[in-house]
């Protein structure tokens, strides 16, 4: 122990004070570091919370955007359908060129015809080919020319009408069935476009172009176009999901509805040609290639069998009593088309049909545009099965221009998705302003035409 004044006492005292002071400093540094750590934790927590809120907002915005574009598609479908059918009803009262629907109604008794509403709907919506389908639903295919129409569609109408023979009921049921299948076709095209392009805006514009396509009112009355489009788009949706046999089955049903359904074989024929090309280049045919070719051939047969079976039934019923039975390929469908509608190569190229060619330009020009736009450097060029779509569209264009009543191309092209994709893509994403303007112009012209077309249909005026 040291007394006060001893040098060692002061040294110990100084050490003690320094020790206490260093402890205070350490404590203060610890508190500062702790505060900094807490601040860092708070900052990271805030950042994480902000990220979560941003992701939540992004999800909400994505969902709201999805619902927005989906709502546009639904509204477009409802608006176009109601508009066309309403105009047809109005025009059927203002100006009627032909009384065939009324005469047919007088020849066939109907309880529903006693109601003014049902009678008005029948004489407004049942025109042209729709009368054939109603009559076939009542009596079956009695006449040779009726074999140019689908035998499945009248059976569907009859089934939905509970096998009734009431022509008014059958006619109205056929229209509402068409509207239903038109809705399915719209939704299938929506899902198909969304699956391929993953772009909601592109999907919505595709559906808008489809709803206002030149097929117009024929998608909502007792015609086969809407059912054919539904089977076609559903088949394509399964095809891109690599469910090829179900796709082939749906396309075979499309062939039962319209004979041009056989062209869906292109989607199996093109890969088969590619496989053969590879085998020829390598001068060998492997087991896997053989199995692929057999698979493609089987799928093509699934699509073709309904068409040729229907031709066989016609041959069995009418032959050997008619001239076409003696042909090398005795098919009833092309025979009655030639006999009753003068269908054949360049037979429609007459001066009096120039107006019908002008009507057909509504489809011819956009299809030509779709072909060139898809081949060019657009995004569509990289689409996997673009070659099959190009061949299908080119084939439709060739047959429509040179082998049939050209204005029918406006209806037949309703099941060409490439047409709507190219128009929608050009309208939204084309680099050239002229191409964007062209897309908007086509949409405007289609809307104007379909409104006029609905009025002409209600008045029983061409084009049909």
From Swiss-Prot:
Lipid bilayer topology: Multi-pass membrane protein
EC supergroup of this enzyme: transferase
Spans within the Cytoplasmic topological domain: 1-70, 188-219, 282-289, 378-388, 462-464
Keyword Endoplasmic reticulum: yes
Pathway this chain belongs to: Glycolipid biosynthesis; glycosylphosphatidylinositol-anchor biosynthesis
A molecular-function term among this protein's GO annotations: glycolipid 1,6-alpha-mannosyltransferase activity
Cell location: Endoplasmic reticulum membrane
Name under which the protein is recorded: GPI mannosyltransferase 2
The species this protein was found in: Schizosaccharomyces pombe (strain 972 / ATCC 24843) (Fission yeast)
């Amino acid at each position: 122990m040291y007394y006060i004044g001893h040098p060692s006492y002061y040294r110990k005292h100084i050490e003690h004070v320094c020790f206490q002071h260093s402890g205070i400093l350490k404590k203060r540094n610890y508190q500062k570091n702790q505060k900094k750590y807490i601040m860092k934790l708070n900052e990271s927590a805030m950042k994480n919370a902000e990220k979560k809120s941003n992701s939540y907002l992004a999800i909400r915005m994505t969902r709201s955007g999805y619902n927005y574009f989906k709502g546009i598609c639904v509204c477009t479908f409802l608006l176009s359908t109601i508009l066309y059918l309403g105009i047809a009803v109005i025009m059927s009262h203002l100006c009627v060129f032909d009384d065939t629907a009324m005469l047919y109604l007088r020849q066939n008794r109907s309880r529903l015809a006693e109601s003014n509403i049902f009678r008005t709907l029948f004489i407004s919506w049942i025109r042209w080919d729709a009368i054939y389908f109603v009559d076939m639903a009542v009596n079956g295919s009695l006449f040779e020319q009726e074999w140019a129409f689908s035998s499945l569609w009248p059976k569907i109408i009859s089934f939905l009408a509970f096998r009734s023979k009431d022509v008014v009921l059958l006619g109205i049921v056929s229209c509402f069935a068409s509207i239903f299948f038109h809705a399915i076709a719209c939704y299938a095209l929506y899902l198909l476009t969304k699956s391929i392009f993953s772009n909601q805006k592109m999907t919505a514009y595709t559906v808008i172009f489809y709803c206002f396509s030149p097929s117009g009112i024929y998608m909502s009355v007792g015609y086969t176009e809407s059912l054919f489009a539904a089977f076609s788009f559903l088949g394509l949706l399964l095809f891109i999901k690599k469910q090829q046999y179900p796709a082939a089955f749906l396309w075979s049903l499309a062939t039962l509805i319209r004979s041009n359904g056989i062209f869906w074989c292109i989607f199996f024929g093109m890969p088969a040609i590619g496989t053969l090309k590879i085998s020829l280049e390598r001068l060998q045919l492997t087991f896997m290639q053989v199995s692929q070719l057999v698979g493609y051939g089987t799928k093509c047969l699934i699509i073709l069998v309904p068409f040729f079976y229907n031709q066989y039934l016609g041959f069995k019923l009418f032959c050997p009593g008619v001239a076409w039975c003696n042909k090398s390929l005795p098919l009833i469908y092309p025979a009655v088309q030639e006999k009753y509608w003068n269908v054949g190569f360049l037979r429609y190229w007459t001066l009096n049909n120039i107006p019908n060619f002008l009507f057909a330009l509504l489809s011819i020009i956009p299809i030509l545009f779709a072909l060139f736009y898809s081949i060019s450097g657009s995004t569509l060029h990289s689409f996997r099965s673009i070659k099959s779509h190009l061949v299908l569209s080119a084939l439709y264009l060739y047959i429509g221009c040179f082998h049939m009543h050209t204005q029918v191309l406006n209806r037949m092209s309703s099941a060409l998705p490439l047409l709507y994709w190219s128009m929608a893509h050009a309208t939204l994403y084309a680099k050239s302003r002229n191409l964007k303007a062209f897309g908007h112009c086509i949409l405007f012209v289609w809307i104007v035409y379909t409104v006029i077309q609905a009025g002409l249909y209600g008045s029983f005026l061409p084009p049909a």
